[in-house]
Structure formats: C-alpha cells, structure tokens
Regions:
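Extracytoplasmic gate region of multi-pass secondary transporters
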Residues: 9-68, 120-129, 156-164
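Primarily residues marking transmembrane-helix entry/exit sites
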Residues: 9-17, 107-111, 142
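A membrane-interface helix-boundary motif in multi-pass transporters
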Residues: 45, 82-85, 168-191
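Loop-to-transmembrane helix entry/capping segments in MFS-fold secondary transporters
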Residues: 46-50, 138-148, 177-180
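Helix-to-loop junctions at the C-terminal end of transmembrane segments
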Residues: 64-80, 168-169
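Paired intracellular helix-loop junctions of major facilitator superfamily
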Residues: 76-78, 132-141, 172
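C-terminal transmembrane helical hairpin of 12-TM major facilitator-type secondary transporters
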Residues: 78-128
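Multi-pass alpha-helical transporter architecture, strongest
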Residues: 95-104, 185-217
Length: 217
C-alpha cells in the first residue's frame, strides 16, 4: 500500500508506469502475433518461425537490454534525466524498424526489421527501471519495481494481443490474410508514445530531483 501511494504521488513514477504500459503493449503484441504473421503472410512453417523468429527476437532482446544498460550508464553518469533520453531515443528508433518488419515483402528482410525493432524496443527497460529504483525510497524499491513489472504484464499480455485480435477481425473482410500485417502496424504507435513520454519524463525527473533530492544507493 505504501509503495502504491508513493507511485501515485510522484509524477515521475506515475509516468514510468505509463511508459512501461505503452512499450509492453507493443512488445507483447508482436511476440504474441508474430508467429501468426509469418505463417499467414510469408508462408513459413512452424519450424521456420520457431527457429528464425526466435533467433531474431532473442538476439535483439539480449543485445538491446545489455546495450541499453551499458549506454545509459556510460552516457548518463548518474543523471536520471539522461537515462530517460536513452530510453526515449531507443523506443522511437524501434518504430521504423517495426514498419520494415511488418511491411517488407521479403521474409528475410522482415526478420532483419524484427531483430532491430526488438533491439531498440527493449531500450526503455534498463534505464526506466534504474530511474524508478533511484527515485524511490530505499525501503520501497522492491515494491516499486514490482508495480512497474506488474503494469507491463497486465497491459502487455492482457491487452496487447487482444487488441490485435480485435483489429484483425475488423480488417479481415477488407484485407484477408494481410489483415494481421496492418493490425500489428497499429501497435507500433505504442512505441512512439513510449519514446515521447520518455522525453517528457526528463523534465519531470529533473523537477522532482530539484524539489526532493534523492541519493541513489
């Protein structure tokens, strides 16, 4: 309860929760419907999807997570506002690669787009978790992190794939099997929103630190 109230009272932490929701909305939608996309649109077998898509997603997420943390630490030097900028640029860069993933006619080119979109898509996570921990009281950091993770799970898994399914049903009469392609294009808006909100977060973080200095441990 205490951690929840702290998150509600802090503009920075509230925004971080929204950022997590926007990014996970796009991320889990692609993970959930990506295999269907490759099977319907590119005619892949389930074995091909498991191998090729799995490699692109796993590789992108691994490099993106490690790279985002490394870049944020090196560039920010402890400045939480700069951490937010790293997260913002990463998620915005993910959107054009997401379009390449979805709109490319060649399946291999689509997989390249998927790899880089996943790489940049995950740039939001290490910096924003670092900011959430640093902006929280020491005794509540575990619960604040839990709230952040819960928000990604509830919105990402609970709403993202459902939204794509509804959009697919609406678009299928007009686009047939291509409906899944355009249904997934809509969720890329979550990445753009996430990136823009990260830049808004730089101001909120600086303002909150100036009003209530926090010593990160």
């Amino acid at each position: 309860k205490e951690a929840f109230l702290i998150a509600l009272r802090s503009p920075s932490l509230r925004l971080l929760l929204i950022i997590a929701m926007c990014c996970s909305f796009a991320g889990y939608s692609i993970l959930g419907w990506g295999p269907t996309f490759y099977i319907r649109v590119h005619g892949m077998t389930t074995m091909q999807v498991g191998g090729l898509m799995g490699l692109a997603v796993a590789g992108g997420l691994f490099i993106g997570n490690v790279g985002a943390g490394r870049i944020a630490d090196r560039v920010a030097k402890g400045d939480f506002a700069v951490y937010m900028q790293v997260a913002g640029w990463g998620t915005i860069l993910a959107a054009p690669f997401g379009l390449l993933f979805l709109l490319a006619a060649d399946p291999m080119l689509s997989l390249v787009g998927l790899f880089f979109s996943k790489l940049f898509m995950t740039f939001w996570m290490p910096p924003t978790y670092a900011v959430a921990v640093g902006m929280s009281p020491v005794r509540n950091r575990g619960m604040i992190t839990a709230l952040l993770t819960l928000s990604t799970t509830v919105v990402g898994i609970g709403m993202g794939p459902v939204f794509v399914g509804v959009m697919n049903d609406l678009l299928e009469p007009s686009f047939g099997k291509e409906a899944i392609r355009y249904s997934l294009v809509f969720v890329l808006g979550g990445l753009v929103a996430c990136g823009l909100l990260c830049f808004v977060g730089t101001k909120l973080v600086r303002r909150e630190i100036a009003a209530r200095p926090v010593t990160a441990q």
